[in-house]
Regions:
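Conserved PLP-binding catalytic core of the aspartate aminotransferase-like
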Residues: 47-88
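Charged, glycine/proline-rich intrinsically disordered loops and linkers
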Residues: 1-6
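Conserved glycine-rich beta-strand-loop-beta hairpin in the small C-terminal domain of fold type I
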Residues: 7-40, 49-60
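PLP-dependent enzyme catalytic core of the Aspartate aminotransferase-like
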Residues: 74, 87-125
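Generic non-transmembrane alpha-helical segments
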Residues: 38, 42, 67-77, 117-124
Length: 125
């Protein structure tokens, strides 16, 4: 390839796969945006508003983050901590942020259930 001076034309198969890939990405984008907006409507007092074109997670800032995470785990909701606490270092971002998954595996009802669980945890626990 170091000596190649021309660019080959994209094959019909590769073009088809590219179009297929782009349609999947578009569907994933719409699902994530819808899920993000739904959680924002229901958890705006806990939301950390991120300026992103392609949200990966809905990030909340909460007290008792680790307890909430364990509670959600009992409901089969697995929330990663992208900013873990570091022993000996106190940081509000590390201690309070929790990432809620919002990808296309989750439906509108799933998002509403997650929001309900989070609000229940803070209203009644």
């Amino acid at each position: 390839l170091d000596r190649q001076t021309w660019i080959n034309k994209i094959s019909s198969y590769s073009l088809f796969r590219l179009i297929d890939f782009l349609s999947v990405i578009e569907g994933e984008y719409k699902a994530r945006k819808n899920n993000y907006n739904l959680l924002y409507e229901n958890l705006k007092d806990k939301a950390i508003k991120l300026n992103t074109n392609y949200p990966s997670f809905f990030v909340i800032s909460v007290e008792k983050r680790d307890e909430l995470r364990k509670f959600l785990f009992t409901k089969k909701i697995f929330c990663p901590v992208h900013w873990p606490s570091i022993e000996g270092v106190s940081c509000q971002v590390n201690d309070k942020c929790l990432s809620i998954p919002i990808d296309s595996r989750y439906s509108r009802n799933d998002m509403l259930q997650i929001a309900t669980y989070i609000n229940y945890f803070y209203d009644y626990k």
